[in-house]
């Protein structure tokens, strides 16, 4: 699974997970839904089916509208989103510790 994030490796390679992975990684920026689909490697029609539930659960938030295009990002004020971000950070630290231990073992 080289080139796949730890978040996806842990939770599975599913469209919703790919979208969340992209939104977590890019949480400081906002994107139109078409770019989210493209960057998350999810079919736009699939994302259109997932999106209402993500909005309803408060995982994503509208940041602004530019010329009729609505921009979104992960809702970092949402407790569930906060825990997902925390999980992603934890997975990265665990992986870094594992690599550090492997490098310390003479071999």
Predicted regions and their residues:
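Short, cationic-aromatic polyanion-contact patches
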Residues: 7-16, 32, 63-87
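Pre-recognition alpha-helix immediately N-terminal to the DNA-recognition helix
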Residues: 17-22
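Short helix-capping/hinge SLiMs at alpha-helix to coil transitions
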Residues: 24-29
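A short acidic, leucine-rich amphipathic alpha-helix
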Residues: 35-38
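Short coil turns linking two alpha-helices in DNA-binding domains
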Residues: 43-46
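Short, hydrophobic-biased segments on the C-terminal half of alpha helices
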Residues: 48-52
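A short, conserved structural fragment
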Residues: 55-65
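Amphipathic alpha-helical dimerization/coiled-coil segments
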Residues: 79-107
